[in-house]
């Protein structure tokens, strides 16, 4: 009996030593990061300068004093830029008549308190005012602002299944701005088609990933084989120890969304592996 217990204890100890050795190996070996181009380093440096990625144009104050977010409006773009921000995430979708507009869903745009149809015509979209006062924005208006302000970078958030088709339209219409559009992909399969279009800067964003894709070791292996600006995830998922270990192993910086508590925002930026944080706060 004593001998059997000793064997069991020995096996348990051996398994623990093997597991500890494996973890030590993962912590100590050099991350297998995909070679990073100077362009990607420049984009990362631009994001890291403040760590702030303004989400959907950021907060605005209405005439009644209400603080609102998610407008993707021209007013929000101008406001966040005047506050000194140079990296902005913008939602983009296509209207019923094929015009690219800056909106998460046109049903969220209010005209005198009434929702527009889910996919409005472009003239209807532009004739309304968001929250009764803010100017809706087309991608044509956005790119004109980008050309007037050459230090501005735009991270795309493209609605539902339109990612590749919208990126193709941007590439065909605004080829001179492709290096300043940072494209978010939502599935591994989107990387190659979008990269082949000529977009050099890609972020892998996990909020639409399915359960299989959200395996962080799988994500780590994907990052080791593809050039990425960053991986964007929710902090609650990242802080699970196995997920954190996988992300740190691949060497690609992490970004979090969306954090509107100022103290938490600054605290997260102190972590060496965090490149930036999406936030509605503009100053």
What residue ranges belong to the model's regions?
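Phosphate-group recognition and catalysis centered on beta-loop-alpha active-site segments
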Residues: 2-283
